[in-house]
């Protein structure tokens, strides 16, 4: 394989909903380029892309697969991405390191929720988009309707380059309005027959050709002037206008294929090779200092590692993009994230499960290495004299969580190691060892996401695991003022223990004025503040601790011990054992003994006094509330809203976005436990959602009583 220069390289992501045919398209592209002699299929479990056992088990792509084809003296690096929303991390990774997105649309269904999700990410990243309508041989495909729907969603930027003469099982020909030719195939596919457009199609073809020319001309002043003068453009001018329109996202060309028979795939590849922008024609990326980094092969050497694969008999395979410079076997590089040194071994061009040895990779290219010493997903390796990092891939918050346990305690350590290893392969996993909940929790993107994790743990790692709903991280607080006092006294021969603490508690809010006077049962307590400590608590909220003791009733040296006693109770609230928050504590009096008082005595006295005061101060349980955005087809809006209301959600607003309804709500975390499953069931898998932590709010009284009763029962069981 020859060395490709930066201006000969194009990086392309294949994205779209599950079942839109991305892996099948990848097979056809490899076949057309002569990389493989026979097309595999998902059903036969022999595709280049879906080579991991878990993918073959479920019949879905789980990981993004990187491969390349050499086409007309150009190198096309292509990433075949998972379509399921549960594996959206793979698509996000690919869209960040490639320069163009081909968004596949299943001709039977038109734009689906996966189409919308991927388009939104391309919008955020400002990536060029080509729409590709697949499955034109389906009975349910109505191309004219589909294009009308797409233009309603994406506007006039969505411009057909091709249209089929007919759809359904008899599909075998299309009209290309860029080249103004008819392409047709034998029923089994094969080489296209290229002919002039039939007379009965000329009017429609000319109308679409004119729309394409006009859309292309809008991207260049000179082309626009020529279009106004001559009402046409040459083929080269048309290509140039489309290329500029792709870069500025002012045009979204629509192509047609039947990927299963390779019909239209060769023509698509010609367009990718001839028209879509090269790496060095795209906007520059930025390092973490905000500096632009150009894909210049003569620049400083810098590699960004965007993916790690774990392969049997090989170990870690590390995939990277050459951000600048050129990388060669034997180069010495420094990991700017970890401070370690790496020597480059054999370099490879990516080919799915296979790798093609190469000696050099230039700026903008994608490649991989095996068995690196200390490189993780997201790391940057730099050459001598440069220290920069890249951190441009942002993954969505998790949407589905489960507590995970190994079936035997002896395997717990092995389980943690396996989970951390799998997170290298899929950074959307979040593994949390919760000290608060005493659980190991895995956070993912959906039920299917966790199901594949379980399969891999059991089949690849030989670990038996169980899942269950995680506990909810409730909080406790108070709603009114209260006071309490407690004397801790212990005498059993020798030195005794003595400490007495009088304190007041009240709800705390940011910016509250310092206390001056309190009244309880007609008695007035004036405060004389000697010291104040405000703590931002690790679990959220604040504790304000005030020393208002006068007359030497308690030595100042015992105040840290009293604060420790208060913090002990804040870490285990009296209602449910949950963390407490947003409390102000004023220690205003107490007693000590000249011999028997010590730090332990005051810690114990403070615990009891605080607990008694907390219970008398209108204690309440708080639950985590999340912001929820649901993207749903209008037909399902009523069912989705009804379901949310049954989950104690508060609807905050509704809006239309790209053909879907966007519903915004606030919902308790407890009600999100199985929401991904319910939403999929309600909408036939045609909706998606995102979540983000918002705040803690009071639980309803009936739920509070239930939670307290459950906690008391747990404590009783532990004591027995």
Q: What do the predicted segments below correspond to?
A:
Residues 73-75, 99-103, 126-132, 248-253, ...:
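Short, surface-exposed connector motifs at secondary-structure boundaries
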Residues 4-7, 45, 236-253, 357-365, ...:
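Short, hydrophobic/aliphatic alpha-helical segments
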Residues 149, 158-160, 164, 168, ...:
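Accessory interaction regions appended to the cores of large information-processing enzymes
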Residues 6-9, 23, 45-46, 59-63, ...:
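Amphipathic alpha-helical transducer elements in NTP-driven molecular machines
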Residues 1-105, 109-111, 160, 204:
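P-loop NTPase switch module centered on the Walker A-proximal segment
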Residues 78-80, 255-256, 442-443:
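Short hydrophobic beta-strand that contains or immediately precedes a catalytic carboxylate
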